[in-house]
Design a protein with these regions (language model features):
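Conserved acidic segment of CheY-like receiver
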Residues: 1-9, 14, 18
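Structural signal for short hydrophobic segments within the conserved structured cores
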Residues: 2, 25-28, 94
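Conserved sequence signature across two-component system core domains
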Residues: 4-5, 30, 48
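Acidic phosphotransfer microenvironment of two-component signaling modules
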Residues: 8, 31-35
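Short helix-capping segments at alpha-helix termini
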Residues: 19-23, 69-70
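Short hydrophobic/Thr-rich beta-strand motif most characteristic of the beta2 strand and flanking loop
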Residues: 23-31, 39
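CheY-like receiver
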Residues: 38-99
Length: 99
């Protein structure tokens, strides 16, 4: 799986949430949209935790860039309810609300 969040605490929280499941392996952590696009193309992850708001290119824009090539299961991470609801327009499997 790939975890993308521009905040170190956000990435750490996701890792901690999933730490007990040996079936899940984090292959890369990203902080920007372009890093995420490269990681998806390099690793073809089955699962992607993706922050909606990233500096520069948004998480949604990054996902749109690779959508025709690779379709990981996506769980959007956001601090805003409106973004969470919009995530389902992009076929998100689920979302996590940041505190």
């Amino acid at each position: 799986m790939v975890i993308t969040d521009d905040e170190p605490a956000g990435r750490a929280s996701i890792r901690a949430l999933l730490a007990g499941d040996a079936r899940l392996e984090v292959v890369e952590e990203c902080t920007t949209g372009p890093e995420t696009v490269r990681a998806i193309r390099d690793h073809h992850p089955d699962l992607l935790f993706l922050d909606v708001q990233l500096p520069g290119q948004s998480g949604i824009a990054a996902l749109t860039e690779v959508a025709e090539e690779i379709r990981p299961v996506v769980i959007f991470v956001t601090a805003y309810d409106a973004h969470a609801l919009r995530a389902f327009d992009f076929e998100a499997a689920d979302y996590l609300l940041k505190p």
